[in-house]
Amino acid sequence: MFESKINPLWQSFILAVQEEVKPALGCTEPISLALAAAAAAAELDGTVERIDAWVSPNLMKNGMGVTVPGTGMVGLPIAAALGALGGDAKAGLEVLKDASAKAVADAKAMLASGHVAVMLQEPCNDILFSRAKVYSGDSWACVTIVGDHTNIVRIETNKGVVFTQADNAQEEEKNSPLGVLSHTSLEEILAFVNAVPFDAIRFILDAARLNGALSQEGLRGSWGLHIGSTLAKQCDRGLLAKDLSTAILIRTSAASDARMGGATLPAMSNSGSGNQGITATVPVMVVAEHVGADDERLARALMLSHLSAIYIHHQLPRLSALCAATTAAMGAAAGMAWLIDGRYDTIAMAISSMIGDVSGMICDGASNSCAMKVSTSASAAWKAVLMALDDTAVTGNEGIVAHNVEQSIANLCSLACRSMQQTDKQIIEIMASKAH
């Protein structure tokens, strides 16, 4: 059995990917609130009649302008209502996957009657916070999610507290597979990818299946800003070359188009984000097809991409002013570089050039325009790989890029953790002013 060949560090890598790379239907911030509402509704015997919800500013930012799958509507109120009336609390990020047409109609009716209120949680010390309190007659139930999109920390009803997360949860995090990433390096990740038995990582091919299907859907329909299908038309008009670079751009943006436009297909997410999962997957798939990679090579490249993206994102807040499609694309750069020449130096140079290129891109909330940023990040990743293949990269003499890739990553993440906090507040203020 392959288990005997896997050391504890490698096992932690595999578990980290299994924990962070999951199917998700719909943008994960409104889905987090939908999950809270579904979990609260599951505690009641009767039908939910009213919902009060509270979210953190960052969750509000990412939930204001994005379409909830199957509804044709944007925003947190419809997500909360559909979660309460048609959600499956056991399905995690796919909480809305089995929502019926009747549940959608009932959710819209609940909104029209003014029985759904979504408010900012103030004060709020948590980047990711969602709380849903649902009412049925004289009964109520309240569920709170903190820190991660599916991390339920408290369940309470009018009869008392049903569940509360253990106080030692933070200590357990340090020893978790994700906690191990704080003490590893890209070199160790590459060594793992090169040597781990294929059967142990075969599961990552599901990312190619799910995100590939989203890409195809994006090219077929007019989802979101339909960037992918629009650029494909420009190829037919002779305004864009039909080459590998364009294929990466079109197929990656098409998947994000479908994702953000409300397609009822799941994305394989990364670090709690469907767009990050798309960005870490589709460019690698396109290059793998170009070089004729078999399933094993594709799986290793995808594992390198996703694990590198998780490794970088683990040094960031769960939500921030930094567009994390950029960090996911750094993972994609690693995966694409590995497919072509496999050298650590090429991978490190590509990531460093990415940090010198797109590190200033802001996150101004989840919306159709995320597909623009996904396509920009994917294109930048391929450009960085092409440079690295010729031993060219942004060097430690320039900007925030350091003389080694690990310090470059640390420099980038320090911006999001500290100096970009004020940027985040300003973005939220601007978006809130537009809502009035």
Curated annotation (Swiss-Prot):
GO molecular function terms listed in the Swiss-Prot or TrEMBL record: L-cysteine desulfhydrase activity
Which cysteines bridge via disulfide bonds? none
Alphabetical list of Pfam families matching this protein: SDH_alpha (PF03313)
Q: Which GO terms describe its biological process?
A: L-cysteine catabolic process to pyruvate
Q: What HAMAP family would the database entry show? A: UPF0597
What is stated as this protein's family in its record? Belongs to the UPF0597 family.
Q: What is this protein called?
A: UPF0597 protein YhaM
